[in-house]
Amino acid sequence: MAVDTLSPDWDFDRVDDGSQKIHAEVQLKNYGRFLEEYTSQLRRIEDALDDLIGDVWDFNLDPIALKLLPYEQSSLLELIKTENKVLNKVITVYAALCCEIKKLKYEAETKFYNGLLFYGEGATDSSMVEGDCQIQMGRFVSFLQELSCFVTRCYEVVMNVIHQLAALYISNKIGPKIIETTGVHFQTMYEHLGELLTVLLTLDEIVDNHVTLKDHWTMYKRLLKSVHHNPSKFGIQEEKLKPFEKFLLKLEGQLLDGMIFQACIEQQFDSLNGGISVSKNSTFAEEFAHSIRSIFANVEAKLGEPSEIDQRDKYVGICGLFVLHFQIFRTVDKKFYKSLLDICKKVPAITLTANIIWFPDNFLIHKMPAAAKLLDRKSLQAIKIHRDTFLQQKAQSLNKDVQSYYVFVSSWMMKMESMLSKEQRMDTFAEDLTNRCNVFIQGFLYAYSISTIIKTTMNLYMSMQKPMTKTSVKALCRLIELLKAIEHMFYRRSMVVADSVSHITQHLQHQALSSISVAKKRVISDKKYSEQRLDVLSALVLAENTLNGPSTKQRRLIVSLALSVGTQMKTFKDEELFPLQVVMKKLDLISELRERVQAQCDCCFLYWHRAVFPIYLDDVYENAVDAARLHYMFSALRDCVPAMMHSRHLESHELLLDCYDKEIMDILNEHLLDKLCKEIEKDLRLSVHTHLKLDDRNPFKVGRKDLALFFSLNPIRFFNRFIDIRAYVTHYLDKTFYNLTTVALHDWATYSEMRNLATQRYGLVMTEAHLPSQTLEQGLDVLEIMRNIHIFVSRYLYNLNNQIFIERTSNNKHLNTINIRHIANSIRTHGTGIMNTTVNFTYQFLKKKFYIFSQFMYDEHIKSRLIKDIRFFREIKDQNDHKYPFDRAEKFNRGIRKLGITPEGQSYLDQFRQLISQIGNAMGYIRMIRSGGLHCSSNAIRFVPDLEDIVSFEELVKEEGLAEETLRAARHLDSVLSDHTRNSAEGTEYFKMLVDVFAPEFRRPKNIHLRNFYIIVPPLTLNFVEHSISCKEKLNKKNKLGAAFTDDGFAMGVAYTLKLLDQYQEFDSLHWFQSVREKYIKEIRAVAKQQNVQSTSQDEKLLQTMNLTQKRLEVYLQEFELLYFSLSSARIFFRADKTAAEENQEKKEKEEETKTSNGDGPESTVSADPVVK
């Protein structure tokens, strides 16, 4: 036919025509070779990249979508060209109407169904404020107007289809026929008409089930009434309000009263102006009834069978057509009506769209009450009972169905993989294509069956308001996963499927053309001429021409219409016609394979059943073995997104999407991610603390889940992001461990161990906290001690030699200790500036303590006793070899006790001893701060190679002429290095500072009463020794209250106070410790002598008493010796070898030397207050 359009200049003779064909074949071979080379080149690139791009596509990434559906660029007029002009017109009209119906159906399914269904979604009752309902409806009115126009158009198309069919099927009595229609049945037309009627009744069902829409509509009308009473208040002109109200009434009557379908079938189909008569056209009535029965026969055979494709949807159309037939012709075929209702036993309910379920029996009884009366009530009741039993049986058989489909789908996937991975051989090419075609169709059939089970079961439960068991929910979710698995399978092998589909369609077209060719030859060979035979031949030629091309929807439609004409007069034998019909059905399926699979695997309905999602997640969590199935479920949840984009009641559909996104993520966090985080954390904690035996960890006794499987999952795609379970849990653990470590730094080792365990057990790559580490023992922070120094010095005891503080008493099972490492780590945390601040805080503390010290020394009872003792010592020192008598110290102790005792049994001297110990503890703490600072500095400076010769980085940078930023960085580095070097080399003389700041005040004439201090030291040491022995005895008796083994704070306090008063010489002049030693040695010898005398008499009790006395004396002597050593050590810190006068002399000499070295320059100013500011 195409040759007719060429100009005469391009006519070739037969020789040229043959040469052209040869040349075309050569070019085709060259092109084929080029493509093969190009393919192999691409394959080599893929191999080099080690990433087979084309083999398997990742459903989650989907960077490129491959659309297989061919697009028809020729118009219907161009496609339908035969010599038979009348036939051309008939086929063109019907094809155009069918195309129109398909477009209307597509528009309804994508735009109008979704717009109506999602109305009112995205806003919870709690977030809705008054007036939101009316605002939503206000936005939605324009959508309803569009829907009204759409429905009107549908009415027009239905009317036109009926008129076009009625015009064709007329009896000879009325007038001449356009074409001979005996044996011609345009079944395709009725199927399309059924589809359009299905659209209308679906719209009715959506509106009928939409309570929110009706409620909002009522509220909106009320709002309009209130506006109507006072339009000026709302800034609306009254003349505009009335037409708008009329328009709303029209919309309500047309769309919201459930009359969309009814109004369509109640149209006036007979032309009033004497045109086409429909209701009285008996030929058309018979043809109409025959077509419905034919379609029904095909549908009934396949309904509920494994090979069912779209029979349910056609059944809805048949019901619509039957009601339309009854409405037009007012005749009922009782037998057929009963057959239609009998289907309800096979199919109790049909899902029209999303969550809209349709009951055929209700529809037929409601739309045809006259026919319903002919049936007995029992049979109608039986249908309803059967629906209930169907649901019960389905609930029981769901698990079996899941297992069966698991096996079916798994074996189908294996077939797909093996078949598509095989290289195609040329000798079995046709057989391979047939196999592939069958496997593809089988996959689609499984998808259809699974989809039907899920939708019917879920929607029936919802419609009948019956609760679903958890078992049923889990089974249905498994089916959803299987459904998505089928879609994923097709998608993964998109490249091979795309390649196969084009070959299969060509193969099927070839088979169809062969069948048509045989029939065409049969018609041509028959020499009898008739117009009917000419129509048949023209129809077959049209079918042939149309099949020679891409398998587009329009071409397949034309072939279907052409064969409706071409199969009359027995042009095909029975054994030829059935295979042709099968081939055409396969061609339909394969040509739209991707679209049909997508439609069946579309889980948009899940939005209305998202209440099952928490139960599903709980199941996934409990059965972590199948964790990977989460991908399928999220793929199903993602299917709701395109539909939501058609919502029109909110400002933007993005609001609805955000709301849905948040809801799903909240459920995921609550039912899976947070539970997983807590479980992993708990497992790590219990594993690290197994030594505590917190609970039974035996996996044979206590069931354990392998949660590690969750971390091997690829990130799950949802909306425009990926949910990475591994990253989520890792972040949670990192955050938790970091926060808990900052609260309790001493636990850093435990959390570090937990991090390592998380890596080993779950493969989680954790981040190091990089917090300053501490030693494993618990250590108080410098800042904490500094702020509470008054509590610290009273609760902790100082050990001079080990330079350690030990807690005095604690309710815990262990005592806290503080050593140089703790202090060094704290200084590293807070910086060296904390040292100076600590000294200042200690200075403030000492000021308060020395005030109490001064008050005690000034007390009349104390002062008078001390003056007496000084006078007494001066008088007897020559007689007593310049030694302070031990008896005098004991007498002083006893005398003080007479002054009074506290409720705790302490004398004033005991309290004074505690004061001195606290002062000494404060000084011990200052010493530890200095040592900790040196420790910290030496740790920081240890990587500097030579402390004596540190290069200047600033100079080096200047020499190289580097940038200003680098110079600044070098200057900072030099500064840091010099600070650390100075700190590590010398440190700061804090003791000297604290002596210098208090000494002048202590030595002033107004504080003359403090000069008596040296004489109170002997009784004070005696008090201390008695207290110390008492504490150590408690330690031996395991009495933790008041037990102690060290308290060098006392020695430090005495040494510091003597230094401040410059009384080392005065104290030494007492020769106190020498006096003590002589006294105890003398007593020990006396006891030993007595023991020798008594050993002859056999009095054992007396001997035991003497032994105990000797031990006691030795213990006392040992304690005094220890105190003497501690005091001697402490005195070294305060330079006990020099008096205040000698120190001043030394200071002056240094100053003179400095002046001499500086020349006679201006005197440098010295700070009056040596305490660090």
From Swiss-Prot:
Sufficient for interaction with WASHC5: region residues: 705-1173
Keyword terms: Acetylation, Coiled coil, Endosome, Phosphoprotein, Protein transport, Transport
Residue stretches of biased makeup (Basic and acidic residues): 1141-1155
Broad class of where this protein is predominantly found: other
Modified residues (Phosphothreonine): T1154
Modified residues (Phosphoserine): S7
Matching InterPro entries: WASH-4_N, WASH-7_C, WASH-7_central, WASH7
Positions where N-acetylalanine occurs in the chain: A2
Compartments reported by the entry: Early endosome
GO process terms (BP): cognition; endolysosomal toll-like receptor signaling pathway; endosomal transport; endosome organization; neuromuscular process; protein transport; regulation of Arp2/3 complex-mediated actin nucleation; regulation of protein complex stability
Coiled-coil positions: 27-56
Region Disordered, annotated ranges: 1141-1173
GO cellular component: BLOC-1 complex; early endosome membrane; endosome; nucleoplasm; WASH complex
Subunit structure as annotated in this protein's UniProt entry: Component of the WASH core complex also described as WASH regulatory complex (SHRC) composed of WASH (WASHC1, WASH2P or WASH3P), WASHC2 (WASHC2A or WASHC2C), WASHC3, WASHC4 and WASHC5. The WASH core complex associates via WASHC2 with the F-actin-capping protein dimer (formed by CAPZA1, CAPZA2 or CAPZA3 and CAPZB) in a transient or substoichiometric manner which was initially described as WASH complex.
Family: Belongs to the SWIP family.
Function comment: Acts as a component of the WASH core complex that functions as a nucleation-promoting factor (NPF) at the surface of endosomes, where it recruits and activates the Arp2/3 complex to induce actin polymerization, playing a key role in the fission of tubules that serve as transport intermediates during endosome sorting.
Name of the protein in question: WASH complex subunit 4
Species name: Mus musculus
Name of the coding gene: Washc4
